[in-house]
Amino acid sequence: MYSRKELANAIRMLSIDAVQNAQSGHPGMPMGMADIAEVLWRSFLKHNPANPNWNDRDRFILSNGHGSMLLYSLLHLTGYNLPIEELKKFRQLNSKTPGHPETGETPGVETTTGPLGQGLANAVGMAIAERTLSSYFNRPGYDIINHYTWVFVGDGCLMEGISHEVCSLAGTLNLGKLIVFYDKNGISIDGKTAHWFTDDTAKRFESYNWHVLDNIDGHDSESIERSIKQAKLITNQPSIIICNTIIGFGSPNKSGTAESHGAPLGEVEISLIREQLKWNYPPFQIPKEIYKKWNFIEEGSKLEKKWNEKFSLYQSKYPDLSTEYLRRINKKLPVEWDRVTNNYISFLQKNRQSIASRKASQNTLEKYAMILPELIGGSADLSPSNLTMWSRCNSIKDNLSGNYIHYGVREFGMTAIANGISHHGGFIPYTATFLMFVEYARNAVRMAALMCTKHIFVYTHDSIGLGEDGPTHQPVEQLSSLRITPNIDVWRPSDQVETAVAWKKAIEKTSGPTALILSRQNLDQFERSSEQLENISYGAYILYDSKKRLDIIFISTGSELNVTLIAAKKLASLGYSVRVVSMPCTSVFDRQDASYKEFVLPTYVAKRVAVEASIEDFWYKYVGINGVIIGMKTFGESAPAEDLFKKFGFTVQNIFNKSLILLKS
């Protein structure tokens, strides 16, 4: 009969052996949190290793993702499709055990973690998703959505500022099914955290309206079990269980020190650990009886079977609700989607209007969201400016089944929370702020791209066109930095029609985020043929053409397209053959086949001009090294928008003059 400590030691030794074998990794945290993990995973976690995607599973998030071997050991021991050979390939090319957990690479990994604190933020999003979905779909006696979100965090996660943003909001939202375990070992890479992290964590979380369980012995299984039971009794507050642990537990010479944090322990020390823990087995060998104690496939399958039976009864009693639930969970758009969106886009083209693209975005939401209950929006305290609310928005603070989150001034937290909402399933999140403040959200934006998360970023006030607020609020380099990030589609529409198309493409995109870059100021609408209207969805299309062998091509986006078109027509009046290309989404255009790209930007035309109120460098890929770019070289200034556009050269006359020089060169 194996004790709980011996079962936990299986985690410790697998982690130690994998790190040693890879000659790289972090053994200390898995050794320190193994006892907590054993209690949670064997006694409380609702999951099915035979079906990692079971909809009503509990979510487990390893926010301190450097300790990934803890999670891989758990997945292997409980019966997920992660054989011992994969643990032997830890941190190696093409393995299922990368250095930090990556969703999509390893069965059972809910979200990619590693940048500290973001896993915690994702978990807050998952807890929001669980509660909002359950409030919408559950009925008396049919709690088809009823699961917990469990999180492991370390000192580093709680030092990161994002932890304040998301834990403050989680307490405000009373997320009672969010339970966090804090691995309080007092050690980080530089040494003892007492020299730089003296917060009273318990009081901090009490101030956030969390239920706090302090001074829990993280190596005492009974204490851990009691604390989890107490946490589950509290339904109107998230809980944090502060566990006092020893990093590198079991290592005679390196436990409790930074030496055990992020490097292999060495063969000599590992031999001593085996003696200390009485683990008399060679590397990567686990006794059959321990495997048997850990394996959760049979129990997990029973849990899912019971849920399936309940859902079958739910389907019989609530056929419409159950059909809608399955549609959303399976990420299917409504049957009327194409009809509604295409009709709306055609309507806009026929009913021309000069409005800001942020207003066009709100109008589009009003139309599309009516048939998309899975849309869940939010803004970082800029809803009236971003125009992200529509007539049927309900705050989830006031209505648990609502569709809008007031995130407060928390751009980073907002973005990472919505990543978690997306990964939970059942929702398409959109989040909003000024384009300039993507800088606050940057790493969560990158993580969305890395994970191919379906998440729509709404970034308004997109250029010097926001005017008097000045260079602190005027984006310059942000557009380019977003465009060069893999997996993100960045749309900068020029009028209400392109805005509606951008929203349609963002919602239809199945893998990866989309950024909608929207103006503060009004934009004129352009005439288009039916072919041009259809070609918007290809990312770039011919807006104006002289219909003969071309002398010059203009490329522009957003608010600068109108002055570019006027300048081009002025050149055409002199007899030059010109083309104007609207390029609202460069990445979508880049994915088109060679024939379409040659059709829009024929290679024989070397004289090209790009016009956009953002940093110039990005556009050389389209105009060539000898092309002309009318863009930003510096930061902006504080002045009315019209004065700034004139100062920085976004005028018909300047575009005309520079193009004429190019033509005569």
UniProtKB/Swiss-Prot annotation:
CDD domains cross-referenced by the UniProt entry: TPP_PYR_DXS_TK_like (cd07033), TPP_TK (cd02012)
Regions annotated as coiled coil: none
Class in the EC hierarchy, top level: transferase
Keyword annotations of the record: Calcium, Magnesium, Metal-binding, Thiamine pyrophosphate, Transferase
Source organism, top-level taxon: Bacteria
UniProt entry tagged with the keyword Nucleotidyltransferase: no
Positions with a binding annotation for substrate: H26, H261, R358, S385, H461, D469, R520
Bias (Low complexity) ranges: 97-114
Location of region: Disordered: 94-114
Cofactor note (record): Binds 1 Mg(2+) ion per subunit. Can also utilize other divalent metal cations, such as Ca(2+), Mn(2+) and Co(2+).
Active-site residues, as the UniProt record annotates them: E411 (proton donor)
Residues where thiamine diphosphate binds: H66, G114, P115, L116, G156, N185, H261, F437
One Gene Ontology cellular component: cytosol
Site, as annotated: Important for catalytic activity: H26, H261
Biological role: Catalyzes the transfer of a two-carbon ketol group from a ketose donor to an aldose acceptor, via a covalent intermediate with the cofactor thiamine pyrophosphate.
Family the UniProt entry places it in: Belongs to the transketolase family.
Protein name: Transketolase
Organism of provenance: Buchnera aphidicola subsp. Acyrthosiphon pisum (strain APS) (Acyrthosiphon pisum symbiotic bacterium)
